[in-house]
Amino acid sequence: MNRKLSREKAMELLFGMTLSKDTMEDAVEAFVENYEGDIKEIDLTYVKQVLIGVNNNKEAIDKVIQENLHNWKIERISKVNLSILRIATYELLYDKEVPRGVAINEALEITRRYSDEKSVSFINGVLDKIKQD
């Protein structure tokens, strides 16, 4: 199983759930049914753990993100970038199995694929501040 790919799919699902208001169960079920690659490459247990973790700690995660924004409001962050920040912040604060550097580097790699270079710098700055707290 590929953790990097699983993290990316967790971000896609979290982003989709933000837009559609689907439940995690519905989103994961639809993902599994429609995934065109080898589903065995995805660690669905990890994906669900991340989605549940972000959902269960969303207020605390958003508070930490907001506290580490400089002259920004969390509402101004694009949904894609916010999904990336939420997953990385969840990993930094709650998932002790993921090294902090890995959580940040993976978030930046996902940002490079789904956003632009300004977003990479922005997310790196926010996560670096969170890591230091």
From Swiss-Prot:
Q: Which UniProt keywords apply?
A: RNA-binding, Transcription, Transcription antitermination, Transcription regulation
Pfam families per UniProt: NusB
Q: Which InterPro entries did the record assign?
A: NusB-like_sf, NusB_fam, NusB_RsmB_TIM44
Q: Name one GO molecular function term.
A: RNA binding
Any keyword Transmembrane?
Answer: no
Listed HAMAP family: NusB
Q: Which family does it belong to?
A: Belongs to the NusB family.
Q: What is this protein called?
A: Transcription antitermination protein NusB
Organism the protein comes from: Clostridium beijerinckii (strain ATCC 51743 / NCIMB 8052) (Clostridium acetobutylicum)
